[in-house]
Structure formats: C-alpha cells, structure tokens
Design a protein with these regions (language model features):
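N-terminal low-complexity segments that are often proline-rich with Ser/Thr-Pro
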Residues: 1-5
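Amphipathic alpha-helices that form helix-helix packing interfaces
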Residues: 19-22, 26-29, 33, 66, ...
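Helix-loop segments that flank and shape redox-cofactor active sites
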Residues: 29-57, 73-87
C-alpha cells in the first residue's frame, strides 16, 4: 500500500480507476472523430495522421502510446515484463480494438497482484 499522509491508496484500484475510464473516454473520442469526419466529408483515416501541435505524435500513435503506458505501467508495478508495443499504423477500428484489449487486460489484473508494489524497484527501460 502507498501511504499518502492520512490517505492509504491501493495501487491496483488507483491504476484501474485511472486508466480504464481514461481509455474508455479515448474510445468515445475516436467514435466522435469518425462521426465528425462523416458529417464533414473528411477521410477519417486522415485524422489519424493529424497532430495537435508540430512537436506531438500523430493521433494514431498517441492512442497506441496511451494503451502501452497503461499496460506497461501496470506490468512493471506488479513485477512482470511489460508487453512490446506495435507502432504500425492502425485504422480507427483496430485502435478501438486495441483500447478494448487494454481495458480487458487491466480489468483481469487483480488488485492482489499489486501487493508489495510500493516497495518494488522499477527499472527504467
């Protein structure tokens, strides 16, 4: 357990209640992007290559990295080898599937797996 002043936070609960809702929101935003592109007659695939700023990654890679960080952080916290990331370009449907697969992976990780995580040294990759 991680002790923050008077507040004790279970790392597993914290991870699940942070990553899962954020990933579900990201999935909904992708749906809105597809709807917007249809309404405006824009190629939806083109949106995946867009960047909010010149020094940012394209949207598709941002989604992949969000999934990777959720899985990677969780794996490292519970003492497992983090999964490899595939950064090949994916269409909207596959990005949504990646998000759902990440949510499922996180959802099947038991809070008990985080026991001792507060004392575990995590090496930077």
């Amino acid at each position: 357990m991680l002790v923050l002043g008077w507040l004790t936070v279970l790392l597993g609960v914290l991870a699940m209640e942070t990553y899962v809702p954020a990933l579900r929101t990201l999935s909904e935003l992708l749906d809105k992007g597809v709807e917007h592109s249809k309404a405006k007659g824009i190629d939806a695939a083109a949106l995946l290559k867009e960047r909010l700023a010149p020094d940012m990654f394209p949207l598709a890679l941002q989604v992949q990295l969000a999934c990777h960080h959720a899985k990677d952080g969780t794996a490292r916290a519970i003492g497992q080898e983090p999964p490899k990331i595939d950064t090949s370009e994916l269409p909207f449907t596959e990005l949504k599937a990646l998000i759902e697969q990440t949510v499922q992976t996180l959802s099947t990780t038991s809070a008990k797996a985080f026991d001792g995580a507060e004392d575990r040294r995590i090496a930077r990759a």
